[in-house]
Amino acid sequence: MLARFPLYLRLIRMDKPIGSLLLLWPTLNALWIASDGHPAPSLVVIFALGTLLMRSAGCAINDYADRDFDRHVKRTAERPLTSGKIRAWEAIAIAVGLALVSFLLILPLNGLTKELSVVAVFVAATYPFMKRFFAIPQAYLGIAFGFGIPMAFAAVQDTVPMIAWAMLAANVFWSVAYDTAYAMVDRDDDLKIGMRTSAITFGRHDVLAIMLCYAAMLGIYVWLGAALHFGWPYWAGWAAAAGCSIYHYTLIKDRERMACFAAFRHNNWLGGVLFAGIAAHYALAVR
């Protein structure tokens, strides 16, 4: 078992934290806004660990669902499950175990948060299979990656206000943007094996679609900042995030594979500076 441990870590992408960070930033945004900048440390720990665990569980489920497709894609052919180094039942067992630990984390929280967690698990577990049916499965991914937002509001306020759903919508647009750039890396392979992705659906309009999704996401955050009367630190963070999106355009405009992958990874900075703006607004407002 110990000899297989490194394979399990690769299965759940512990060597690639970018996915966890893309889940974490929107969740932290929600925690800070829901608590007026003063989230309980215990909640921050619970949601940070929950984000890591559920993203890891999602990776295991994704590799299980895609195991027959991944062997035909150069980038994924050597994943532990695809290459036969671990078995399918091991991936399922790991996913279930991680999901159970995640549920244990939220046991101290209120009933609404627990109810929403059931929806979150369902969406996360079914996302990998949506790539067979949906033309833009990245939108479904945005719901899965962003469900920590309504859960955070529920944990703090015991309700989910409209602003939480607006933030979830923003996350859907953001996910479509960054994951389309990611899908552009594998587009040729995905076309051969019949996988459905937004990069294939958007076709020659892929770059335009990505930039429109960034614009929609940033537009929602303009409304959010105005509605909550945020000060200049927030708008500085927003401007930095907008600058990141423009930089991403320079990377994806020629559709070069590695540049598209770099744009995907750089979204960590976009999410980070936006959260920094929110946190700085509340921190400076106290003084």
Swiss-Prot record:
Cofactor: Mg(2+)
GO molecular function: 4-hydroxybenzoate polyprenyltransferase activity
A Gene Ontology cellular-component term: plasma membrane
Enzyme Commission number: 2.5.1.39
GO biological process: ubiquinone biosynthetic process
TM annotation in the entry: 30-50, 92-112, 133-153, 158-178, 207-227, 232-252, 266-286
Membrane topology qualifier: Multi-pass membrane protein
PROSITE patterns per UniProt: UBIA
Subcellular location: Cell inner membrane
CDD domains assigned to the protein according to its UniProt record, in alphabetical order: PT_UbiA_COQ2 (cd13959)
Catalytic function, reaction form: all-trans-octaprenyl diphosphate + 4-hydroxybenzoate = 4-hydroxy-3-(all-trans-octaprenyl)benzoate + diphosphate
Pathway: Cofactor biosynthesis; ubiquinone biosynthesis
Top-level class of the enzyme under EC nomenclature: transferase
Keywords assigned by UniProt, alphabetized: Cell inner membrane, Cell membrane, Magnesium, Membrane, Transferase, Transmembrane, Transmembrane helix, Ubiquinone biosynthesis
Family: Belongs to the UbiA prenyltransferase family.
Function statement: Catalyzes the prenylation of para-hydroxybenzoate (PHB) with an all-trans polyprenyl group. Mediates the second step in the final reaction sequence of ubiquinone-8 (UQ-8) biosynthesis, which is the condensation of the polyisoprenoid side chain with PHB, generating the first membrane-bound Q intermediate 3-octaprenyl-4-hydroxybenzoate.
Name the record gives this protein: 4-hydroxybenzoate octaprenyltransferase
Protein's organism: Burkholderia mallei (strain ATCC 23344)
